[in-house]
Regions:
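A short, Lys/Arg-rich alpha-helix, primarily the initiator
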Residues: 1-44, 88
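Interfacial/linker helices and their anchor residues that mediate assembly or domain coupling
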Residues: 6, 98-120
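N-terminal positioning helix adjacent to the helix-turn-helix/winged-helix DNA-binding module
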Residues: 23, 27-28, 57-60, 75
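Core residues of bacterial helix-turn-helix
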Residues: 38, 49-54, 83
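Residue-level signal for the short linker/turn that defines the boundary of a DNA-recognition helix
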Residues: 39-44, 56, 71-74
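Short alpha-helical "recognition helix" segments of helix-turn-helix
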Residues: 44-50, 79
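Recognition helix of helix-turn-helix/homeodomain-like DNA-binding domains
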Residues: 50-71, 93
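Short, basic-rich loop-to-helix N-cap that marks the start of a DNA-contacting helix
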Residues: 66-81, 97
Length: 120
């Protein structure tokens, strides 16, 4: 809990974790949208990235899409490979956790026609 005292957390999110990648909302939504389109569904995308839940393998993808959690670096590398993008290109859109807000996520979802994922 020392992180809360020292200011290294933003709403429970560590400011820096090398294994977690926070992407800007506008880029994150587009990236996941392309992944969903290529895979065919959010659950199929979850399976492509290695999520193995039998009930809802797309749950973690949804959490990342909505900005509730960061991309684990290993899953982001799989996403880059799946979409045929260089990981360096994706990492150029890395941001700090506090820059990922509900407002920026809602705006990005609306601009990309993903109203069905709108957070309430």
């Amino acid at each position: 809990m020392t992180g809360f005292v020292s200011g290294n957390f933003h709403f429970g999110r560590p400011e820096f974790d090398p294994d977690k990648v926070w992407l800007s909302s506008s880029y994150r939504v587009v990236l996941i949208k392309h992944g969903i389109e290529k895979a065919g569904s959010i659950n199929k995308l979850g399976r492509e990235l290695g999520y193995r839940s039998r009930v809802h393998p797309g749950w973690s993808i949804r959490q990342i899409l909505l900005g509730y959690q960061a991309f684990p670096l290993d899953r982001l590398k799989r996403m880059a490979e799946f979409l045929g993008l260089p990981i360096e290109e994706i990492l150029r859109h890395q941001t700090k956790p506090k820059a990922v807000t509900i407002e920026s996520t809602k705006d990005a979802l609306a601009r990309n026609g993903l109203y069905c994922y709108y957070p309430r």
